[in-house]
């Protein structure tokens, strides 16, 4: 009887663990019709290879930045939960209309103030493929500018050491 209870506990624990892990894989739909988390991770890997970014680094950054949520929005340090693109666009436009420019947008959390001019519009910034491509080019340019991937990671988040120390640790652990 004890063995049966232990087996049931083990099976229950395994199911709970798998539910948690699989439920948090970041499998969000993207702008790529009928895409899913698998497409997203495959795309990130492809972008890493094309831009000569070490395997898994861009994926780690995206995971830390947004949890793989293509509609992630952060306004002046406050995370806004947007479940779809239209809600994210509306939230961002409202903030911009109020004069706010410190807005991190999309799956790789590209900052509107510093990088918004490199996109046609907010919708393009929220497009996961475009957002990831831009993040890769930004990360590569930071690597060239600062000489190491660890420094590039820090500066991807912020040039301010008080802001990037904890962030870079999270990314390195995820990497």
Predicted segment positions?
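Boundary at the C-terminal end of the N-terminal hydrophobic targeting segment
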Residues: 25-29
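Short, contiguous, well-ordered secondary-structure segments
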Residues: 1-3, 22-24
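Bacterial N-terminal signal peptides
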Residues: 13-23
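Bacterial N-terminal signal peptides that target proteins for export
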Residues: 3-14
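Catalytic glycan-binding domains that act on GlcNAc-containing polysaccharides
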Residues: 30-175
